């Protein structure tokens, strides 16, 4: 019976699907595809692929990532210690639109969060933003205000780095486009 268990059976759960609408698939390590559904466990190295659907992932450190229609997100690794509220999080947004909302890892040690697109690396300092990647790899990144359940909003900061250099974004709805690996 043990021979039929997948790698995910032995891995640590790093989050779960907290919103599911329409068509989406989670590709596990080793190539197994699992149809997305509410409360489905998510593991490091999973890939989220949406068709005509949307998925939101709630990570163990309270980070939230929304993956919209026709998008692809590759989770590299998430490590989290709830006692110290520290760890690391890294993933790649490859296609489509993804919204990121910071959890505890970004709030306690922002340098431990690494988010990549085909043309940029984003450093997070406790905030929300969206990134849209088109079919040729161009990345559009927009900083968003973070609001709590009482409607209190603040704007954090992100850095966007490419081969051309780095910019700091700290104004609500500030945007940048990175067209190719060598542009800013």
Model regions: which residues?
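Sec-dependent signal peptide recognition
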Residues: 1-3
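N-terminal signal peptide c-region/cleavage motif recognized by signal peptidases
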Residues: 6-8
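Outer membrane pore-forming secretion/assembly proteins and partners of Gram-negative envelopes
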Residues: 130, 183-184
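Flexible, surface-exposed loop/linker segments and immediately adjacent secondary-structure boundaries
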Residues: 11-52, 56-166, 171-175
